[in-house]
Amino acid sequence: MSEGRTDGDTWGPAQSVGATATMVAAARAVASQGPDALLDDPLAEPLVRAVGLDPFIRIVDGKLDFPDDPLFNRRARAEQITVRTRFFDDFFIDATEGGLRQAVILASGLDTRAYRLAWPAGTVVYEIDQPQVIAFKTDTLANLGAAPTAERRTISIDLRDDWPAALREGGFDVTRPTAWSAEGLLPYLPPEAQDRLFDNITALSAPGSRLATEHVPDPNAFSDERLARISERWQRLGLNLNAADLFYRGERNVVADYLTGKGWRVTPHPARQLYARNGFEFPEDEMRATFGEMSYVDATLTGGRG
């Protein structure tokens, strides 16, 4: 890729932003392998194979590894995706145990939570993503004989468009508290679209709604140096992707502060603490150099709609 993002650009699971979703699914597949598997996502591997990108198939098959890379070797990548996946899994489990029966997975990609989590009876799970991505995953999992464990409703729309209207048209109930996830999404939105995303979530959320996302307190987290580090790793995989072409740069509002200002009670979970909680050693120097001081965020809407 030699050109940056444009308004209205689209993709499937093998192109552009979609290929990074497949990369994440490949990591989940690796973390789900073997007798000492860190995750249990049996649908990740067949989805990756169905996409058909050779580097990710080689990763899943154990034929491609970078043992000298403290962040990108097979074990480190499995631990990194395990920390992230368990955080969002636990978020949804806790939210539904607290009585929430409506969930929205923003930029759902090849996420399989609607198929693999034990959702309580009556739970409705909405998935929002690009039409090509939604169609690919739905058709592939149907061909595999996989069935959702909740009522799954798909909303095929770009998050830069009027997705709130599409969500309501899909049956979303604004009177019910909702569990929202925005996982691995924010760098792919322009700074103003990030704010608009949280504004829309707040406007659609009844009191008691919850939100999980990532949070980098540095408003200039995606510097040229950090993007170059990410791109170098992608290109070592054999992917002709440049992070500077996919991520939107520019100063952003700090997620935790912005949500607090919208009436959310925000609890940050620093990545290093989640690594320790999972029994993993945190790759301190390399993680900070590449991603900054990243935290995961669990927020609860305490008041009325903003």
Swiss-Prot record:
Q: Which InterPro entries does the UniProt record give?
A: Ppm1/Ppm2/Tcmp, SAM-dependent_MTases_sf, SAM_mthyl_Trfase_ML2640-like
Which EC number(s) does UniProt give?
2.1.1.-
Q: Which UniProt keywords apply?
A: Methyltransferase, S-adenosyl-L-methionine, Transferase
Enzyme class per UniProt: transferase
> What is one Pfam family matched by this protein?
LCM
Indicate which residues the UniProt annotation says bind S-adenosyl-L-methionine.
129, 158-159
Q: Name one GO molecular function term.
A: methyltransferase activity
Q: Does the keyword S-adenosyl-L-methionine apply?
A: yes
Q: Which top-rank group of organisms is this from? A: Bacteria
GO BP: any one term = methylation
Gene3D superfamilies, from UniProt? Vaccinia Virus protein VP39
Protein name per the record: Putative S-adenosyl-L-methionine-dependent methyltransferase MAV_4442
